[in-house]
Swiss-Prot record:
GO annotation, cellular component aspect: ribonucleoprotein complex; ribosome
Cofactor binding note from Swiss-Prot or TrEMBL: Binds 1 zinc ion per subunit.
GO biological process: translation
Name of the molecule in the record: Large ribosomal subunit protein bL31
Coiled-coil residue windows: none
Family matches, as InterPro entries: Ribosomal_bL28/bL31-like_sf, Ribosomal_bL31, Ribosomal_bL31_A, Ribosomal_bL31_sf
Gene3D superfamilies the UniProt entry points to: Ribosomal protein L31 (4.10.830.30)
UniProt organism field: Desulfatibacillum aliphaticivorans
Amino acid sequence: MKKDIHPKYETTVIRCACGATVEAGSTVDDLTVEICSQCHPFFTGKQKLVDTAGRIERFRRKYAKFNQAQEAKQDQ
């Protein structure tokens, strides 16, 4: 076997945006992740509300003109 062809495998600290840290083995020195099992809604059982009301209103305003044009076309 050839010597010195494999990457260095060492203990790595994985940091989440929520502040949690986990130690694991990796070839990368430090890892940063956006979400982990300690803050993900699936694992915690908590749901984060997303502002869907604003999105729905924006969608309705966007397509209101389209719907009015379709109704006017059908009335003719």
